[in-house]
Swiss-Prot record:
It is an enzyme of class 2 (transferase). The active site is at residue 418. PANTHER family: PTHR11061:SF45, RNA M5U METHYLTRANSFERASE. CDD domains: AdoMet_MTases. It holds the Pfam family tRNA_U5-meth_tr. This is Uncharacterized RNA methyltransferase BH0897. Residues 9-67 form the TRAM domain. It comes from Halalkalibacterium halodurans (strain ATCC BAA-125 / DSM 18197 / FERM 7344 / JCM 9153 / C-125). Gene3D superfamilies: 2.40.50.1070, Nucleic acid-binding proteins, Vaccinia Virus protein VP39. S-adenosyl-L-methionine binds at residues 293, 322, 343, 391.
């Protein structure tokens, strides 16, 4: 439908009743007005609402709730005082039990929309949730901003320059909440300039804190625009004094005009360069920029699903693509003949090697680089993988990697996904090359958000 036709039907400011049919991939309610898709943040399936159009796009419209005529029985009051402003969570107004069902439904809808597979023929298992879905995040990344002389540390409202000050967050571990609040107060006391995005002035951009759930070790990273600045030594001393349990204090320098949190250079200000975390029987060393799953308790459940899907017997050669600090590969190593992994972040690979060494795991090998370049070189040297595990970013697998996988033809692919849409699109390509989806296991890694993690098993059956 053309944009002109859409504008002829829907206008900004227009109000009308709407029945919500389902949840969208971003957690918004989805309804249809004269065959036009309308996204309504905060609305739930089955609800009858009166909405006001806030924006009209070529293929859909966005609207806000003006009145709820018929409320969902699954609607609850959000416990977070800044839930409507922050945007970090999208589903605190939906009961947790219902959230788990909806996340499975989001996966199903993604396959209906992006594949030729019939969703009713797929084995999509019930979502694995948490017993206590609060205080689960081990890492906090808050932007710093000074307004009317007051230093704020928080998150930006989506698509705006408004920063919501977060003195505490219900989904963050208490240690990260404390660290962020203490650093914010020190910056206020010392009057250190925070970064001004518009003027590109100031020093401190962000405070990042990470805690080991099992070890209790705390890491604080100060993201700055330059390496040296006034009162830097005093800032370090104050953090050491007010956060005496901090094990690792790092500085990351990011001088660029970018939405990315961290830059390329990290230096140690105090203590160790890494902190330790334990998953199951395996301990991991985490540097400032290293990726590590944000919910350790659910990570163990997810990785056990990966191990179950891989179905290793001790004879298989396994590739851990997008390996990060080696978490998945090391989890599988005791049941594999050999595990090889790669990642584009050099520090992550160094951590992966160190993690393997510390565990005494000798049947693993890690390289810096892109999977789509490294895997063919292994194949050329007659090292053919039996199982490939992929855990890509939200954008999904690189097209060249998918091409490489299809050429390599491993017996099994275990696809760990954080985005049902890109998962479905990638699966569509793989199933055309002879792979069959055996099952999809959603895992709720981020309670109260719209994000859905999943573990999908694909088996090569030939064309």
């Amino acid at each position: 439908m053309t944009k002109q036709a859409t504008n002829a039907v829907l206008k900004k400011g227009q109000r009308f009743p709407l029945t919500i049919k389902r949840l969208g991939i971003n957690g918004e309610g989805v309804g249809y007005f004269k065959r036009h898709v309308v996204f309504v943040p905060g609305a739930l399936p089955g609800e009858e609402v009166v909405v006001e159009v806030t924006d009209v796009k070529p293929r859909f419209a966005e609207a806000s709730i003006r009145k709820i005529r018929k409320s969902s029985p699954d609607r609850i009051s959000p416990p977070c005082p800044v839930y409507d402003q922050c945007g970090g969570c999208q589903l605190q107004h939906l009961s947790y039990e219902a959230t788990l069902k909806e996340k499975r439904e989001i996966v199903k809808q993604a396959f209906e929309r992006h594949t030729t597979l019939r969703a009713d023929t797929l084995t999509i298992l019930p979502t694995i949730g948490m017993e206590d879905p609060w205080a689960y995040r081990n890492k906090s990344q808050l932007q710093l901003k000074t307004e009317k002389g007051q230093v704020k540390a928080g998150l930006y409202v989506m698509n705006t320059h408004k920063l919501v000050d977060l003195s505490s967050c219900l989904v963050q571990h208490d240690a990260t909440n404390e660290a962020s609040e203490v650093v914010k107060q020190i910056v206020q006391d010392l009057q250190i300039p925070t970064y001004n995005e518009r003027k590109r002035t100031g020093i401190l951009r962000s405070v990042v804190s990470r805690v080991g759930f099992e070890t209790g070790e705390l890491q604080v990273i100060l993201v700055t625009t330059k390496k040296d600045f006034p009162k830097k030594d005093l800032l370090v001393e104050e953090i050491k004094s007010r956060l005496p349990h901090v094990k690792s204090l790092q500085q990351n320098i990011n001088p660029k005009k970018t939405s990315l949190i961290m830059g390329d250079e990290t230096i140690s200000l105090f203590g160790e360069e890494t902190i330790e975390e334990t998953l199951g029987d395996i301990s991991f060393s985490l540097s400032a920029r290293a990726f590590f799953q944000l919910n350790p308790k659910q990570t163990v459940k997810l990785y056990n699903e990966v191990k179950r899907a891989a179905a290793l017997t001790g004879k298989e050669k396994v590739i851990d693509a997008y390996c990060g600090v080696g978490t998945i590969g090391l989890w599988l190593a005791d049941q594999a003949r050999e595990v090889r992994g790669m990642d584009v972040i050099a520090e992550a690979i160094e951590d992966a090697k160190e993690n393997a060494k510390r565990q005494g795991i000798t049947n693993v090998q890690y390289e810096v680089g892109k999977a789509e370049k490294i895997i063919p070189s292994w194949v050329r040297s007659s090292w053919i993988p039996d199982v490939i595990v992929v855990d890509p970013p939200r954008t999904g697998c690189d097209d060249q990697l998918l091409k490489t996988i299809k050429q390599t033809k491993p017996k099994r692919i275990v696809y760990v996904s954080c985005n049902p849409s890109t998962l479905a699109k990638d699966v569509e390509q793989l199933q055309r090359s002879g792979y069959k989806v055996k099952n999809i296991q959603p895992v709720d890694m981020f309670p109260w958000t719209a994000q859905v993690e999943s573990c999908t098993l694909l088996v090569y059956e030939g064309k």
